[in-house]
Amino acid sequence: MPPAVKAVTFDAATWRDLGPRMLELERQEWGPRAFSPREMRWQATNRDAVVMTTWDGPILIGFAVAGPAWTDGRASLLNVLIDPAYRGRGLVWPLIAAVERALFARGIRELDIDARVENGFADNVERHYGSRATVIEQDHPSPYGRQRTIRVRVAAKAGRRAPKATRSSRGGKRPAESR
């Protein structure tokens, strides 16, 4: 069974349950540069945050947190991590797509992503989002290594597969109707 993406609304009890694993993933990735427990808790429990998690059965294997930006209608992807043992399977995209759908439902139409350059994530973000992505700040130094800031136009149906083409009565292909 493929890993499942779930929305989580954080409160103090949820943080006590999931916070340690989120911090573990953060420290695995960033070592001494990892966000502090206080910062991670603020990100997850902020009332304006959107938190999505990825699970392999009972094991939390990834999460994404988006929070408010300084501009109306825009959010920032504050954190996104996948357990190193699960990387390379495309799990980050359904996770971010779930964040997008939740943001869209709240009226947010843009998501800023500070994407790491060194591991190829910045290039992958641009490739994945195509015309919905605009580089707003080229590769620049940060405490986390070189990053590229990419603004993504949020889509209501982010991550949903397009309907397959169907055959018309005349035998030609036509796209299935979508709304």
PLM feature spans:
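Acetyl-CoA-dependent GNAT
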Residues: T9-L78, D83, I96, A102, ...
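Conserved acetyl-CoA pyrophosphate-binding loop and the N-cap/start of the following alpha-helix
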Residues: Y86, G90-A98
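Short coil/turn segments at alpha/beta junctions that flank glycine-rich nucleotide-binding fingerprints
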Residues: R33, R89, R106-R109
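Conserved active-site alpha-helix within GNAT-family acetyltransferase domains
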Residues: V117-E137
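Short acidic/glycine-enriched loop/turn segments that link adjacent beta-strands
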Residues: T71-G73, N119, P141-Q147
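Conserved GNAT acetyl-CoA-binding A-motif
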Residues: L103-A115
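C-terminal "cap" of GNAT-fold acetyltransferases
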Residues: R132-R179
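A short, internal acetyl-CoA/4′-phosphopantetheine-binding micro-motif in the GNAT/acyltransferase core
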Residues: V80-R87, A115-V117
